[in-house]
UniProtKB/Swiss-Prot annotation:
Coiled coil feature spans: none
InterPro entries, A to Z: Aminotrans_II_pyridoxalP_BS, Aminotransferase_I/II_large, HisP_aminotrans, PyrdxlP-dep_Trfase, PyrdxlP-dep_Trfase_major, PyrdxlP-dep_Trfase_small
GO biological process: L-histidine biosynthetic process
CDD domains: AAT_like
Family membership: Belongs to the class-II pyridoxal-phosphate-dependent aminotransferase family. Histidinol-phosphate aminotransferase subfamily.
One family name in Pfam for this protein: Aminotran_1_2
PTM sites of type N6-(pyridoxal phosphate)lysine: 210
HAMAP family attached to this UniProt entry: HisC_aminotrans_2 (MF_01023)
UniProt name for this protein: Histidinol-phosphate aminotransferase
Catalytic activity annotation: L-histidinol phosphate + 2-oxoglutarate = 3-(imidazol-4-yl)-2-oxopropyl phosphate + L-glutamate
Membrane-spanning intervals of the chain: none
Keyword Amino-acid biosynthesis: yes
Enzyme Commission (EC) number: 2.6.1.9
Gene field: hisC
Length: 362
């Protein structure tokens, strides 16, 4: 059997572990630890008893209208709905980057970007962050074969951000579209939605998997100028969003007060997590997302991860060649974070990692 050469050469993207529900404290894939709001649950229940023998709205019109209203956009023609923001990213790579052409991404960041380029038979260029997590000037350099630049903002695994003025300047320096992946933007102090309206080369991708607590339904969207949306609509699957997810996502857009409350609560827990890790001697990168990236001067990150896993707590161990490794810990409930911190301290004791004299696990 003969596959496309690009497929034979590529390595698959490996997502975070998804254990059976209830067996682990799960702090490894940046999900919202709180359930979605009641109106979303009601919308799902109502849609589940609706005419599921019929195809859904191929354009997810109700969601696009609700999103435009919630986000202050001129109209639904500025929004394209997708089966998770990963599908939106797939459409962008498919629409702009041909075989043998290139896309650019920062490093370390979301590894799926490389996979999407590989699927296309395209090239990808990784530009390493300067220490500490700052984009180098070379990230904005043009090249004839460069067709798309992807920038997660906030970034994963670091949780760091590039400011809006920097992004506007970056777009001005490029001759190709700049995709700002705002999967975690609700946890940050600013976003780039207004830049989309003034710059046709800036696109913003969003997901409902993080702040909205809807990772299980798979729904994301693109915000771009209407002519971009119209062109990308040509290459999307005919019915890419199902009726239940459209209903849930539409209802979620009407829950902005709930969103603000849950984000504020998670940000308090995030900052508390940062303080606890620093008290244990970890170097923690200031985060604008729903996770923290930490490294210990004595290392042993893989061993800490394994100790916690054996104790039924999942965090994410990540090792980036030529950059180093570390631990990414999702923001959970306060009780989940308390359990995680206690087990990290026990892991450090077991692994003979130095503990500060006044480290406190309470």
């Amino acid at each position: 059997m003969q596959y496309r050469p690009a497929l034979s050469k590529m390595k698959p993207y490996v997502p975070g572990e998804q254990p059976p529900p209830g067996k682990f404290i799960k702090l490894n894939t940046n999900e919202n630890p709180y359930p979605p709001p009641a109106p979303v649950v009601s919308a799902i229940q109502s849609a589940a008893t609706g005419p599921l023998n019929r195809y859904p709205d191929p354009m997810a019109t109700s969601f696009r209208r609700a999103a435009a209203n919630a986000l202050g956009l001129p109209g639904p023609e500025w929004v394209l709905a997708g089966n998770g923001s990963d599908e939106i990213l797939t459409l962008l790579v498919r629409g702009f980057v041909g075989e043998g052409e290139s896309l650019r991404l920062p490093y370390p960041s979301y590894i799926l970007y490389r996979t999407l380029a590989d699927i296309q038979g395209a090239n990808w260029e990784q530009v390493p962050f300067n220490d500490p997590w700052e984009l180098p000037q070379s990230f904005g350099e043009n090249r004839e074969d460069l067709k798309l630049v992807l920038l997660p903002n906030p970034n994963s695994p670091s949780g760091t951000i590039v400011s809006k003025p920097q992004i506007a300047e970056l777009s001005n320096s490029l001759n190709c579209p700049l995709v700002v992946d705002e999967a975690y933007a609700d946890f940050a102090e600013e976003n780039c939605l207004d830049l989309v309206q003034s710059d046709e080369n800036i696109f913003v991708t969003r997901t409902l998997s993080k702040s909205y607590g809807l990772a299980g339904i798979r729904f994301g969207f693109l915000v771009a100028q209407p002519h971009v949306i119209a062109e990308l609509t040509k290459i999307k699957d005919s019915y890419n969003c199902d009726a239940i997810s459209i209903a849930a996502a539409t209802a979620a857009m009407g829950c902005q007060e709930w969103l603000a409350d849950v984000v504020a609560k998670m940000n308090v827990t995030r900052d508390r997590t940062t303080d606890r890790l620093r008290a244990l001697g970890f170097d923690v990168t200031p985060s604008h997302a729903n996770f923290v990236w930490c490294r210990h001067p004595e290392g042993k990150h893989a061993e800490i991860h394994q100790y916690l896993k054996q104790s039924q707590i999942l965090i994410r161990y990540m090792d980036f060649p030529d950059w180093g490794d570390g631990l990414r810990i999702s923001v959970g409930t306060d009780d989940q974070i308390d359990a995680c911190m206690l087990m990290i301290e026990r892991a450090m004791q077991s692994l003979n990692i130095s503990l500060p004299a006044r480290a406190d696990s309470t």
